[in-house]
Amino acid sequence: MEGAAAREARGTETPRASAPPPAPSEPPAAPRARPRLVFRTQLAHGSPTGKIEGFTNVRELYAKIAEAFGIAPTEILFCTLNSHKVDMQKLLGGQIGLEDFIFAHVRGETKEVEVTKTEDALGLTITDNGAGYAFIKRIKEGSIINRIEAVCVGDSIEAINDHSIVGCRHYEVAKMLRELPKSQPFTLRLVQPKRAFDMIGQRSRSSKCPVEAKVTSGRETLRLRSGGAATVEEAPSEFEEEASRKVDDLLESYMGIRDPELASTMVETSKKTASAQEFARCLDSVLGEFAFPDEFVVEVWAAIGEAREACG
């Protein structure tokens, strides 16, 4: 007789393999966390290297640098990138390359000079640091100011005829200087950047408008904004750089200022508009405090168009 176990085995079919359970769905990939942005910094006249992070605009940047070196933020006149020298082509504006080294130029000696305005133009190009100080970016060869040896590129203008201009924007200071009457002497109170020994005696000036040096290293930059958070962006395109340079040149010729960040903002605004009239309306809403004259806006629109054609 067959055993019960044998009969049971013969009468039982091999069970069909069951389908494997469905694999658990992959959770959506978490967005890649951006690494902390830490920048190296020194005082331009000499100091140990500090590290700063967590700023979104120029005022906050100055506060972080001041904290790193135990000084007041108001001691900082301006910053340059990757050079400790008073080099106006390396000024820190609205963008910092992620590998850039920041040098802070602090207040040095105060000096007063008397100037007589014998011509309509003094020969100064003014810019500002975005935190309340206007300073000299360029001195035109052969101009009134060029003949005054005590006045140097990088000097901050603190007062005109004892009237403090601390807190004024560059275009306001340039307008005050333009409106000073001819043939009457006036006094400028200037603060020069503190200098290391190897920087003493430099007096940089230029009558021309060289192309602003590219100070970013790498294709990403930290874009500082006067309102809102800073953002990491791709470095400007060839068109954006060329258009911004042309607009900055026009700012200098019309208003006596240079401001690459302002020029960049105007180029960005132009991308959202299809005509000079629409561009003018957008500028009024974004940059109304500048009160740009109509003929200036038309020239800016044309210059941006030329840059777009040149860069394809």
UniProtKB/Swiss-Prot annotation:
Residues 112-192 form the PDZ domain. Residues 1-13 have a biased composition (Basic and acidic residues). PROSITE patterns: PDZ (PS50106). It is linked to Deafness, autosomal recessive, 15: A form of non-syndromic sensorineural hearing loss with prelingual onset. Sensorineural deafness results from damage to the neural receptors of the inner ear, the nerve pathways to the brain, or the area of the brain that receives sound information. Residues 18-30 have a biased composition (Pro residues). Keywords: Deafness, Disease variant, Non-syndromic deafness. Residues 1-32 are annotated as: Disordered. It comes from the Eukaryota. Required for postnatal maturation of the hair bundle and long-term survival of hair cells and spiral ganglion. This is PDZ domain-containing protein GIPC3. The keyword Ion transport does not apply. Widely expressed in adult and fetal tissues. Highest levels are found in jejunum, lymph node, parietal lobe, fetal spleen and fetal thymus. Expressed in cervical, melanoma, chronic myelogenous and gastric cancer cell lines. Transmembrane segments: none annotated. Belongs to the GIPC family. InterPro entries: GH2_GIPC, GIPC1-3_GH1, GIPC1/2/3, PDZ, PDZ_sf.
